Amino acid sequence: MPRTSLLTLACALATGASAFSYGAAIPQSTQEKQFSQEFRDGYSILKHYGGNGPYSERVSYGIARDPPTGCEVDQVIMVKRHGERYPSPSAGKSIEEALAKVYSINTTEYKGDLAFLNDWTYYVPNECYYNAETTSGPYAGLLDAYNHGNDYKARYGHLWNGETVVPFFSSGYGRVIETARKFGEGFFGYNYSTNAALNIISESEVMGADSLTPTCDTDNDQTTCDNLTYQLPQFKVAAARLNSQNPGMNLTASDVYNLIVMASFELNARPFSNWINAFTQDEWVSFGYVEDLNYYYCAGPGDKNMAAVGAVYANASLTLLNQGPKEAGPLFFNFAHDTNITPILAALGVLIPNEDLPLDRVAFGNPYSIGNIVPMGGHLTIERLSCQATALSDKGTYVRLVLNEAVLPFNDCTSGPGYSCPLANYTSILNKNLPDYTTTCNVSASYPQYLSFWWNYNTTTELNYRSSPIACQEGDAMD
């Protein structure tokens, strides 16, 4: 036996590892690396867009996405943010004001980092596109939704027999409804028109707890959110650089922030954005952190009441998990907004920083990176696993959280197969820790006090398709 093979075998015996793992059959003389030593996810602008840019999968812990050996997914509960969209009308107004300053110098030739403006046009065709989901380019929102449905058909199609009518649920906002429809087309294919039943749940506060978008109108922890400045020193540096390259522009740090907001939306509608390179990597990192602050203090664990808001979904999904697929059903697909997913994560107690995020500097290494949590099309999937006994765990039922297609361990409850949590333990933890929504948010007694639509749903297909044109800047489709 060659010396190299003996050495491999000796090392394997000493460590208990297989001598032939990771492609040991590949000739030892090859110079090609089996694994790349370059990991550049941290440099991707998609991770510094905050919640504005195209979907990207969460950076994982290396836990296999497929079910652990000996386990089968028997129930899925998903909540998905709408797909990629154009800016909101309010953001559009600020963007147009910043662009007006850029164009005010009446130059025939922009220079430096803005030289591309000599050929560039704004990607929003007219004001009616504000709020709408995008339909053009490889990152288009409706394309994202359809592809996601198709991917989940491949992953979870075994949970549908091809004959029963499956209800799925959308909040009553225009782009959310369109996302749900495209996802449904991707998942059900030709059967979408007959075997899927879209249920649209109003976003009105009078829905109380029977909602995908519960509100907390008595929220008394919004002081930090209300006083966020959306500024870091790097924006002043960017303004000075762009002004020096194009005299007379007179951009401020606030203008730069609005231009970066504009840049962060462009890929939603186009395959390429020159605006990305108009700002440095440091400036993008700063922007991403400003977005982290916005979500943390305005719709996440930085607001002590958000866990109660998210508890509505967390508690109802816990009931589904304990009822199981035979009693409750196997598939629960839900569609809402980014700021409806972040409270759920707060309620579950995952991705909580050890201390509040500082406002005056970037907190590197904190777990609350919004580009990894709720990009456009972001989604939280709860899997119920039916598992056989292994050397490490008993036969039984387990729970896994999957955030943007990366397994997210449930805090210290990871004793199950694939670092899953035993359903009994998951239930005990949530029953102990979930706050009460109706009490915390002083929900009117005349409003619904719990989520019921997962059990009381329609099975008609009347809402599967639009019956009227999309309105200009359409928001709440149920107004």
From Swiss-Prot:
Pfam families: His_Phos_2. CDD domains: HP_HAP_like. GO terms for cellular component: fungal-type cell wall. The active site is at H82, D338. It is an enzyme of class 3 (hydrolase). It catalyses: 1D-myo-inositol hexakisphosphate + H2O = 1D-myo-inositol 1,2,4,5,6-pentakisphosphate + phosphate. Keywords: Glycoprotein, Hydrolase, Signal. Gene3D superfamilies: Phosphoglycerate mutase-like. Glycans are attached at N106, N191, N227, N250, N315, N425, N442, N458. Catalyzes the hydrolysis of inorganic orthophosphate from phytate. Residues 1-19 form the signal peptide. The keyword Signal applies. Belongs to the histidine acid phosphatase family. Its EC number is 3.1.3.8. One of its GO terms (molecular function) is acid phosphatase activity. This is 3-phytase B.
